[in-house]
């Protein structure tokens, strides 16, 4: 097995669709801050969560710790409080009450987004009224959250009312495209089409808007309507581009029935028709076009078709990307053709493209299916010694492999490596480990990792609660369960109302 000579960013096949979604964006994106490492923000957020009292202000807590609140620190703190909306709002109102308020338009937008996620729209509207300076972004955040909550009519009304708060600055085509794009992404394509038909005279239209609507119909698996809008687009004098055709192609391939064989072949013919139409209009398929079709072949385990398509791609002078190679490697591994997959891995590196952890995960999943502990460990040790380090998903696959094989010492080794890695364990990691320990009746260890999971801020799945609960009772470990339940009650404030979604049904042995 060839070692990596260069670091590649992790890639997952679902990112292909996400990338297409990004490409067809109408041009307006919400520029909200992203979560960044910040020890001060961690300290403040944990202090507010632990010591929050709805009947007392939080000024003393912050002043006693001598904390100076900069705009960036406020943003990072609010991001860490996004799952505790009441505390986030109290913190924000405290900032506004200061003699020199340290709130900014960005912090207003953040709290509006946080409150919108939990449908506190009355509070959001009041905050917008109280804002000194609103921006188009403020209203588009509100529009997005209303649509996400299923309040589509209110979202359109908020879009229409925005100019009253923006000194009569009317929205343009780019913001109109954002409205349509958001409606389509949340599955309200029919309403998006209605809004488009009503207002296209006012806002106009372009290839991006039509591409958004075509993508919306594809999301609903209505390829017939997507093709109809493509025809309407051309008849309106707007030329489709390669992105438009890739969206349609992705819709056809994503909804493709892989079985029986007749249906799969029909979908292949439909995809080839899109390629033919592209060429007739003078548009050459690009690497994304080929990658979409390759991914469909890979899902159907059609190794020969996948390899032939890659050869055709190279013959046309199109260099495969890491996404393309990963699709082919996945197909070869799932078909049991590991030697060919390894040869392709060498070809990747020779072409200057280093496999990512996702590429290696294809091998690990095949080893898991084969119950090949030696093959998995050999590859894992090569990755550890190379430049491409295992991702959290890699560790999760390995944990599942060795838990199933009952090799708990190896599980411990992998878990220690995961905790020492840059990413660390996630919810899936803890879930796999706790369930695996329960299956081996290692109750003490299972309880320990269960508590650790909660302390790290991961809300366990209901099934995990029930598995541990029933297992402890069946094993006459009621005292252990009571101690564990007490710990859970102490930690429940971390999750707020979410914690209440996991009630325990009385269980009898």
Swiss-Prot record:
Localisation: Mitochondrion
Gene Ontology, cellular component aspect: mitochondrion
Keyword Oxidoreductase: no
Keyword terms of this UniProt record: Mitochondrion, Repeat, Transit peptide
PPR repeats: 172-202, 206-240, 241-285, 286-320, 321-355, 356-390, 391-425, 426-460
Organism superkingdom: Eukaryota
InterPro entries (alphabetical): Pentatricopeptide_rpt, TPR-like_helical_dom_sf
Mitochondrion in keyword set: yes
Transit peptide feature range: 1-19
Family stated for the protein in its record: Belongs to the PPR family. P subfamily.
Protein name as annotated: Pentatricopeptide repeat-containing protein At2g13420, mitochondrial
Organism the protein comes from: Arabidopsis thaliana
């Amino acid at each position: 097995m060839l070692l990596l000579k260069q670091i590649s960013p992790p890639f997952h096949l679902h990112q292909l669709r996400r990338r297409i979604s990004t490409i067809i964006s109408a041009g307006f994106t919400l520029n909200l801050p992203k979560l960044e490492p910040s020890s001060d923000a961690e300290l403040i957020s944990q202090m507010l969560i632990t010591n929050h009292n709805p009947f007392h202000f939080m000024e003393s807590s912050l002043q006693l710790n001598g904390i100076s609140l900069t705009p960036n620190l406020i943003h990072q703190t609010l991001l860490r409080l996004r799952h505790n909306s009441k505390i986030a709002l109290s913190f924000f109102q405290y900032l506004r009450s200061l003699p020199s308020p340290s709130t900014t338009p960005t912090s207003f937008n953040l709290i509006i987004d946080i409150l919108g996620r939990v449908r506190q729209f009355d509070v959001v509207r009041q905050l917008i009224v109280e804002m000194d300076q609103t921006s188009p972004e403020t209203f588009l955040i509100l529009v997005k959250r209303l649509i996400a909550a299923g309040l589509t009519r209110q979202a359109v009304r908020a879009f229409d009312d925005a100019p009253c708060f923006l000194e009569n600055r009317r929205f343009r085509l780019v913001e109109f495209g954002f409205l349509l794009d958001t409606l389509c992404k949340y599955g309200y394509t029919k309403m998006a089409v209605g809004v488009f038909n009503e207002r296209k005279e006012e806002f106009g239209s372009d290839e991006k808007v039509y591409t958004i609507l075509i993508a919306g119909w594809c999301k609903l698996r209505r390829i017939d309507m997507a093709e109809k809008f493509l025809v309407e687009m051309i008849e309106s004098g707007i030329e489709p581009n390669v992105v438009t055709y890739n969206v349609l192609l992705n819709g056809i391939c994503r909804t493709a029935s892989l079985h029986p064989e007749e249906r799969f072949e029909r979908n292949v013919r439909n995809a080839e028709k899109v390629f033919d139409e592209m060429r007739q209009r003078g548009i050459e398929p690009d690497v994304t076009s080929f990658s979409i079709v390759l991914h469909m072949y890979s899902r159907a385990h059609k190794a020969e078709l996948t390899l032939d398509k890659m050869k055709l791609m190279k013959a046309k002078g199109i260099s495969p990307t890491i996404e393309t190679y990963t699709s082919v490697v996945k197909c070869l591994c799932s078909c049991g053709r590991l030697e060919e997959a390894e040869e392709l891995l060498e070809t990747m590196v020779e072409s200057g493209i280093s496999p990512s952890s996702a590429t290696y995960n294809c091998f690990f999943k095949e080893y898991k299916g084969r119950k090949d502990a030696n093959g998995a460990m050999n590859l894992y040790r090569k990755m550890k010694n190379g430049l491409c380090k295992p991702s959290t998903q890699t560790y999760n696959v390995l944990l599942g492999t060795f838990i199933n094989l009952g090799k708990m010492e190896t599980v411990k080794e992998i878990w220690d490596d995961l905790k020492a890695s840059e990413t660390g364990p996630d919810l899936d990691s803890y879930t796999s480990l706790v369930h695996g320990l329960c299956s081996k009746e290692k109750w003490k260890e299972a309880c320990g990792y269960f508590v650790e999971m909660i302390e790290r801020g991961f809300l366990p799945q209901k099934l995990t609660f029930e598995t541990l609960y029933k297992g402890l009772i069946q094993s006459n470990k009621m005292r252990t369960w009571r101690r564990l339940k007490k710990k859970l009650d102490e930690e429940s404030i971390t999750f707020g109302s979410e914690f209440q979604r996991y009630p325990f049904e009385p269980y009898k042995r």
